[in-house]
């Protein structure tokens, strides 16, 4: 599916909004949602860290892994993976601003880690790597932004070695009929649309050649994430010319969209 938004729109969005999101989402530059359990309570950043841990556990990532981080943003998770797992990671992102941030942040890491990590500007639909380059493809809060999703899934499959693992989360559209509010504050605001529900996404993955090892509907965790973010942004007041108030309202609308079945979130573990 190719939507009305372009990769250039997405690149411009994240180039311009990075500082705002850092100021209340995560000052280290991470930008994804969280998995809430007894260990996290209602702490949003703990829930984000728990999602990272859960994905590592499910994907079986060890120090021999060669990981492609698809949509790496500011490189925060890639550096966490390298530090925590001792693996090699290459991160790609459309945003030149965020890739520059990642490359700069890497210079502050130990020299040994710098030899195992790298970041480059690239599109998920045209990956600059040979076939079978990676043991794992990892992605968080990214593929919904890719306007040719089938191409991105094919490219992820291509660069994985035989038996390699794709582990990722993505937004889904549980039903095709959505309200004007959901269109405005969810889909148009985030410059995306998707043909996939939680179930039909699995069909697309199978059609690409993946075996589905596990699929988990995380929509309740998406709702909890935006409930937290609405409060955090709202508490910022009128800083950034009222941007926080706008975001807090939009996040409340996203909570409502999840409640109404107009927005979902899934985690997928697949094997080539």
Task: Name each model feature, range by range.
Residues 125-136:
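A short acidic, Gly/Pro-enriched loop at the edge of an enzyme's catalytic core
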Residues 171-192:
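Short, glycine-/aromatic-enriched active-site segment of Class I SAM-dependent methyltransferases
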Residues 1-23:
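N-terminal auxiliary segments of SAM/dcSAM-dependent transferases
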Residues 193-209:
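Short alpha-helix
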Residues 150-165:
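A short glycine-rich, Lys/Arg-flanked "PGG" loop and its adjoining helix->strand segment in the class I
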Residues 66-70, 74-126:
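Class I SAM-dependent methyltransferase SAM/SAH-binding core
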Residues 27-37, 42-63:
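Conserved alpha-helix/loop element of class I SAM-dependent methyltransferases that forms part
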Residues 214-272:
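Conserved Class I S-adenosyl-L-methionine
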